[in-house]
Amino acid sequence: MPQVIFETEDWSTMVFLFTNINEPNHNGKAMTRAAFREYIARQNVTDCSKPINVHWNKSDTHTFAVVACSSEKIGVDIEYMKKRPFEKISRRYFHEHEVTDDMEIFFDLWCQKEAYTKWKKERIAENMRVKIDRPLIPLENLPDNVVGYLCT
């Protein structure tokens, strides 16, 4: 059963966390179906309602995954923070004003840019230097050393 780590008041957008995804029973399709079941169960549907239009996006890192479901276009990213050559990577992918060797700043920027790019439905490599012009929601209730953002 996935854990809800974000939901709007009207349940039009929800983010589900899956842990221990390296176990055999945690495959991508099963996780997505479980998130859809939970999301659809909370939607206000009557006998006369049209089929629910679900936009979704998922991300995984280390042994964790999130699936975001929404009635609107959505992008999500999570990253497990670990030591890397941050300055070298940020020089390659980020705008020159965003170059950093700080792990938390690097992963915050990376997750924001990846969530935004997924929301735009574009290639990540082509969009890491762009300025984000949408509100981003930091995901809370994530495991230690995991950072994540949602773009709606």
Predicted feature descriptions by range:
Residues M1-T152:
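Core catalytic alpha/beta fold that binds nucleotide/phospho-ligands
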